[in-house]
Each structure stands twice: as structure tokens, then as C-alpha cells.
Design a protein with these regions (language model features):
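RNase H-like nuclease module associated with reverse transcription
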Residues: 12, 51-164
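RNase H-like nuclease fold core
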Residues: 7, 12-58
Length: 164
């Protein structure tokens, strides 16, 4: 496969991930929200209901993070094939501390099979060091926009953060 030589200044890729657990009052399905930034510029966003009903916030946040990791992998491949260098690991921000911690611990054991599959996908990316999972408090998580209706104060704060 002929790939172009990497040229130019390396770009920084980051992802904000969030899930609204059981936010749909009719079906109780969760909602995923993702925002992908390239050098602090929003280049992609994703907002969609999840296909399964989750019994825990951990499960819905893990599904959201796995969706984000899949999108990041596709973006990294596109940038790689265009010869755009990437500056280290992609920063992935999530507002659930337990999801962040389990993504970083290889000895974690999960009992639900579908959660374990999503976890291993995230864990493989973290072990390969092409993502770095970090905690982002819910008050400043930009992907919160895409999952639920926010109070006016929080919405203004996130909009201000997004536009600066």
C-alpha cells in the first residue's frame, strides 16, 4: 500500500464523549453524544440513540466511548493515508470516572459480555497508545450538548467554551 510521506505540522486530535442514560422516557434507551476536534477546531459530531437498553450508566457511557473510539480510528486512518502527521495519542474525555479508570486498567474484569466487548475495544486502543482516556467533569464536557436539554446557564457556558 502506497502511503504519502507525512508532511507538515502534526495535528492534535481530541474527542469528548457523553451518554444520557435512559434519557428516552418511552423506550428508556440511552443517547450518545460525541465531538471530535482537530487542533481545537470541531470537525465532527455525532448524536444518536443507542441500539440497546442499558441497566447502568457505566454501560451506556462505555457504549458511547466505544463508538467514539471507532470514529477516532477511522479518522486516524484517513489522516494517515493523506500524509497528515498526528501529534501522539488522541485525548479522549469522558465524564464517568469508572469508565475512565477501567479503560486504563488491563486487569479489569467485567461480568456482562456486551460491556466486556466494548471495554476490550477501548482497552486495545489505550494499550496501543493511540488514545489517552481522561476524566472531564460533566459541567465542562462539550458532548453534553448532544445528549440532553441543558439549563440555560450551562448551555451558555458550554457555548462560550466551544466558540473561544
Amino acid at each position: 500500500m502506497n502511503k504519502p510521506e507525512a508532511r507538515g505540522t502534526p495535528v492534535k486530535v481530541s474527542l469528548f464523549s457523553d451518554a444520557d442514560h435512559a434519557g428516552n422516557l418511552l423506550t428508556r434507551r440511552s443517547h450518545t453524544g460525541l465531538m471530535i476536534f482537530l487542533n481545537n477546531s470541531l470537525i465532527d459530531w455525532y448524536s444518536k440513540g443507542q441500539a440497546t437498553v442499558e441497566s447502568s450508566t457505566f454501560g451506556s457511557e462505555t457504549i458511547a466511548l466505544r463508538t467514539g473510539v471507532d470514529k477516532l480510528q477511522a479518522l486516524r486512518y484517513k489522516l494517515y493515508m493523506m500524509g497528515v502527521p498526528i501529534d501522539g495519542a488522541c485525548d479522549v474525555f469522558c465524564d464517568n470516572q469508572s469508565v475512565c479508570l477501567t479503560a486504563q486498567k488491563p486487569e479489569t474484569r467485567l461480568n456482562k459480555k456486551h460491556n466486556a466487548i466494548n471495554y476490550h475495544r477501548i482497552r486495545e486502543a489505550a494499550a496501543a497508545q493511540w488514545i489517552r482516556v481522561a476524566f472531564e467533569p460533566g459541567i465542562s464536557n462539550l458532548a453534553d450538548f448532544l445528549t440532553k436539554i441543558l439549563p440555560i446557564g450551562k448551555r451558555k457556558n458550554l457555548l462560550w467554551t466551544l466558540t473561544r
